[in-house]
A protein has these predicted regions:
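Lipid interaction determinants
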Residues: 12-79, 88-138
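C-terminal motif of bacterial Sec signal peptides marking the signal peptidase cleavage site
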Residues: 7-10
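Acyl-CoA/ACP chain-elongation machinery
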Residues: 83
């Protein structure tokens, strides 16, 4: 009887974790992927970089639930890169061509500090660098 309790209890914890994972994945799929974004705010050590991104539209395209292509479009020019996330969707790695100077700031590992759309707020992953990136869904 006691062994059955622990066995059932262990299964329910796994089921709860799987359900939480499914909710996170569904939110990311529905609200982050395949949506158009613009830079709402970009600061690097207090310097406002937002104007550098004026006119750009960014789109994270679903490849798998954890990675895929990203596009940055300005006028008719499209730049291609990649994005990836971790299993709990708390991290977003953006890689864009660093031949475009404004993409150097964006191409890094970010952590989500807020996903309250229409604005997703990001800060550097694993560091306290004073960098901020806010992306607004269009």
């Amino acid at each position: 009887m006691i062994a059955s309790f622990f066995l059932l209890n262990g299964c329910s914890k796994s089921a709860i974790e799987q359900a939480q994972q499914n909710v996170l994945q569904q939110y990311f799929d529905d609200n982050i992927l395949n949506q158009n974004y613009r830079v709402h705010l970009a600061t690097d050590n207090g310097a406002d970089l937002t104007s550098q991104y004026s006119g750009y539209v960014f789109r994270l395209i679903k490849g798998t639930s954890f990675d895929g292509p990203v596009t940055a479009t300005i006028n008719t020019t499209v730049y291609n890169g990649t994005w990836s996330t971790n299993s709990d969707y708390s991290k977003l790695t953006i890689t864009l061509p660093t031949t475009v100077p404004e993409f150097i700031f964006m191409s890094r590992e970010w952590k989500f500090t807020h996903k309250a759309l229409p604005i997703m707020e990001l800060a550097p992953w694993g560091t306290t660098e004073p960098k901020v990136l806010h992306m607004e869904r269009l």
